[in-house]
Swiss-Prot record:
Residues 102-215, 528-570 are annotated as: Disordered. Residues 232-324 form the ARID domain. Keywords: Cytoplasm, DNA-binding, Nucleus, Phosphoprotein, Transcription, Transcription regulation. It comes from the Eukaryota. This is AT-rich interactive domain-containing protein 3A. Transcription factor. The gene is arid3a. One of its GO terms (molecular function) is DNA binding. The keyword Transcription applies.
Length: 570
């Protein structure tokens, strides 16, 4: 066809040139033969019309030639691409068959691999929309996959599920990603959330692999199990809505939580919690055990409440706030903080005022309020001073609180340890209460006054309780009273930090009387010199050892008594 058109074009061009060359002859002929001017004009017009027709025919032929050449180039390009696609597809099929025959290692099961290999062809339209997946493929391979997807047909139906908008997960299968000619073939494709089951080529060969790796669920299998846990019609609707909401929120669900070796039923968890009034109500009422039973989880799971609360906050609580509005994030944080403080108060209350004859060598302290250690006098007159360490948000409170209250007694070693443990427990509880009061936002001046009063009251109460506890455990006769004619000054507490306590203790017939004066804390938390007034009266000769007590809170005093007369505490 091309040859015929070229020959016709050449003949037309020759005819046009010959007619053009004969034009001067025709023009000059009228003068030579003596014809009239009118006849010469008509011939000239006829020649011009003939030339115009020939030129139009020549242009039309040239246009046809150009179109024919374009069609020929396109046809040859398409034929070459089809041949390349067919060759690459044969290599691809050979690689897949070789992978199945050899048994692909590191794959969860045979069925997901086959589904991925088939969906690599069916879902190529989605792959063209993703620039990251196209990065490793050239134009010819993309054309090949597009052509194959047209031949297969119906490939997009698998992606019409509720989770088609989620980003794909890339899985690499070693040994199945290269053809026999080392042509890179990409097998990492996203599988639909719950695709229709397909029959494997050799189920008997793939069954052992599926059984050996039964517990290693893939991302798609987890979603499929979540949708197929029961036949509730609202389950699919809820899960579709939940995943769409999380995707729009910018926090897509990329994995399903596993609890007790099974997929956590998000639908049932949400339904149980919202029926109880929402997450905040469940936390405040502490009914996580009912939620655990409703989910058919074993009750022996450790920290099940914490795990369920964490997973609910991550996957379901934003959806609850959006759809139901049962609580706000501020209320949730307040409920969590309240639950945490309650747990600490219970642990403190269990050890408060408990006396143990053995005691513990270490002293308890508040976990969140760490204050400096005090200097303790030793029997040989030396001092053991520990480096102060303060860790508190409010710096002005550092000079008003202490970390430990030591009451070393010369009766026995375990007596002093028990006294110290009980006093430390008392102070830990007091410091926890003070911390909660301080967090309520009171002025700094009022905080200091409240702490001074609280410390003085706690220390006197701790002394009395500890001595009574020893009296119940040991065969001693102890009397504790306030001997002072002025009853109003027996316990003098004031808000300016100045106070005094008159104490009288009788142990095994020996009476120890003293006045505890308040003093202001030193700058470096070192004990300052203080005089202590005391009286000593004995009924008969007694060689019982003296009782020396050293109490050093922030607004308390130090006192020591012995059988030799007045003494000054270091």
């Amino acid at each position: 066809m091309v040859d015929n058109t070229s020959i016709a074009t050449k003949s037309a061009l020759q005819a046009a040139f010959s007619s053009a060359s004969s034009l001067p002859l025709l023009v000059s002929s009228p003068g030579a033969h003596g014809q009239s001017g009118g006849g010469g004009g008509m011939k000239l017009e006829a020649v011009m019309e003939n030339l115009q027709r020939q030129q139009a025919a020549r242009l039309a032929l040239e246009e046809k030639l150009r179109q024919a050449e374009k069609e020929k180039d396109i046809r040859s390009m398409v034929e070459s691409q089809i041949q390349q696609q067919a060759l690459a597809f044969r290599h691809y099929q050979a690689a897949v068959r070789g992978a199945f025959a050899a048994g692909v290692p590191n794959s969860s099961s045979g069925h997901p691999l086959e589904r991925r290999a088939e969906s690599d062809i069916d879902d190529e339209d989605d792959e063209d929309d993703d620039p990251e997946l196209d990065r490793g493929m050239d134009d010819e391979e993309r054309d090949m996959d597009e052509d194959d997807s047209m031949n297969e047909g119906g490939g997009d139906e698998d992606l019409e599920g509720p989770l088609a908008h989620y980003p794909p997960r890339h899985a690499v299968y070693p040994g199945a990603g290269q053809s026999p000619k080392s042509t890179p073939i990409h097998l990492s494709r996203v599988q639909p959330p719950y695709p229709a089951p397909r029959q494997a080529e050799s189920p008997s060969a793939l069954a052992p692999q599926a059984q050996s790796q039964h517990h290693e669920w893939t991302y798609e299998e987890q979603f499929k199990q979540l949708y197929e846990l029961d036949d509730d019609e609202k389950r699919k609707e809820f899960l579709d809505d939940l995943f769409s909401f999380m995707q729009k929120r910018g926090t897509p669900v990329n994995r399903i939580p596993i609890m007790a070796k099974q997929v956590l039923d998000l639908y049932t968890l949400y339904k149980l919690v919202t029926e109880k009034g929402g997450l905040v109500e469940v936390i405040n009422k502490k009914i996580w055990r009912e939620i655990t039973k409703g989910l058919n989880l074993p009750t022996s799971i450790t920290s099940a409440a914490f795990t369920l609360r964490t997973q609910y906050m991550k996957y379901l609580y934003p959806y609850e706030c959006e759809k139901r509005g049962l609580s706000s994030p501020g209320e949730l944080q307040a409920a969590i903080d309240s639950n945490r403080r309650e747990g600490r108060r219970q642990s403190y209350g269990s050890t408060l005022f408990n006396y143990s004859p053995v005691g513990t060598p270490t002293l308890l302290a508040s976990p969140k309020l760490q204050m400096p250690h005090i200097s303790m006098p030793t029997p040989n007159g030396g001092h053991m001073t520990q480096t102060p360490g303060i860790k508190k948000e409010d710096s002005m409170l550092s000079s008003c609180l202490t970390n430990r209250v030591g009451i070393p007694m010369s009766l026995a070693g375990h007596h002093s340890a028990a006294q110290a443990a009980a006093a430390a427990a008392v102070q830990a509880a007091a410091l926890e209460q003070l911390r909660e009061k301080l967090e309520s936002g009171e002025p700094p001046e009022k905080k200091v006054m409240l702490m001074a009063e609280e410390q003085q009251r706690i220390m006197q109460h701790a002394l009395q309780q500890n001595l009574f506890a020893m009296a119940t455990q040991l065969p001693m006769n102890i009397k504790l009273n306030n001997r002072d004619d002025r009853q109003e000054t027996a316990l003098n507490l004031s808000t300016n930090g100045i106070s005094s306590i008159n104490m009288s203790i009788e142990i095994n017939g020996v009476v120890y009387t003293g006045v505890l004066f308040a003093r202001k804390p030193a700058i470096g938390f070192m004990p300052s010199s203080q005089r202590v007034h005391h009286q000593h009266s004995s009924q008969g000769k007694s060689n019982s050892p003296g009782l020396s007590s050293h109490i050093q809170p922030s607004s308390s005093a130090s006192s020591s008594a012995s059988s030799h007369g007045p003494a000054t505490s270091p």
